[in-house]
Amino acid sequence: MICYSLGNFCFGGNKNPADKNTAIYQQSFTLINGELQPGIDAQIIPCTLSSVSSYNDFRPTVASGEKAQEICNLMNTYSQNCSNIEIDGLGKLHVN
């Protein structure tokens, strides 16, 4: 998994970006007796950069319903040629 630009989740560089879709990446690691266990326990939390669609109010909002599904689908489309990971409708990452 490659995550890009985690430090710029919301910034004032664009007052109304055409694409307000974004996501929070969440990774969990399991240690047993100090040993890292194999497997991926990761998800994305689909979000929008703004709480309104007409302009950027700089209030990131967790997406839900159809918007969340749309963001997950876009992430799958962006990743299909370079990854064996698929994101389900709830944001959970699965290795194919």
Where would I find each of the regions flagged by the language model?
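Conserved beta-sheet core of the metallophosphoesterase superfamily
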Residues: M1-Y25
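A short C-terminal boundary segment appended to hydrolase-like catalytic domains
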Residues: N16-N96
